[in-house]
């Protein structure tokens, strides 16, 4: 395995400093040991569980010295529960990616800010009544109040009314009023096919936009391109919905303003119509061959930039949109109480320590993915994600900068920082290309920090405090 930058990553720490350091357990460590661990943490961005590589970095052909050992590489996990540090880095990149497509920067011209742009939310339909926090302005409304004298009991005899004004932290939010009435099969199938539904939405959107603008589809393709970035988010009921920034550009590789007939108001209306048109018949379990899926009626589209006519709502704040999408690009990748890895057996589902509602969704995905069912066998692969197996942040090719470009820029910046005092070899001496042979030969050695030494514990505590700030 070849790893760039490995030579600098295992450079030995100079043996000098103010003296020994005492840990919380009164264990004395040397300043050099603490600084060595601190440098390791800095190189991995204080990663919680880095990848450990063992091998050789370089060879001094004159002296025979070999630079090698254990190299720690950041895990790069974007899940907030798996690694707060790598997740925070991913969140920052996501924010820059979204913001660049709204205001310019990172190679995108600032003129993109004048383009028609909309923040859209596509939700799932109802699969049964659930507890919800309902608002009117800033007032919290009763969840499901009884408004007439009809019987508010379901076919199973359960009361499906709820007069409670739920708070944000109420654990009942998203839970069905009656678990036996709730359509768990359809809910899991919606999650599984959510990516396909969004793809169909992007197919229907240009058609409806052309009709509303009074042009043919061919003329629309000649006039503009639709760029977007979207993030998937779990609702409290465990169902995926999408938030998307959708922008109109003229054709070509640049970021040119499209013709003035295509406004944000027209785009808002087209988004609503396209979402209503999406339909997908998915195979289900025995005795129920097909389930018709589509987006719910609560599709929302709001302009981000002011246009001559605004279809609905008020223009949204750019920072709020960028921060919102970046937040859920990392947070939504986790389902509370469920493992981050695949479930291997039905017995593992029984042992899950999560809300009963989520456990029933996992069980439904497992059952639909069984060889006896008519569903897709990949449902078992994504049972721990309640059926959803797609990416949580995706974008069209030319919306803005890419994650890879941001990472390359950051790596180059760090390389230049390290070279500020002159290029040095792995032994801390001025680099002599004629005698230092760079090898960079590494093999996988494990996960996590190599040894829980006092220096490691103290450095990790420092990293935790830094993340807290």
List where the protein language model places each region.
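Histidine-centered divalent-metal-coordination microenvironment in nucleic-acid enzymes
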Residues: 83, 120, 220-253, 325
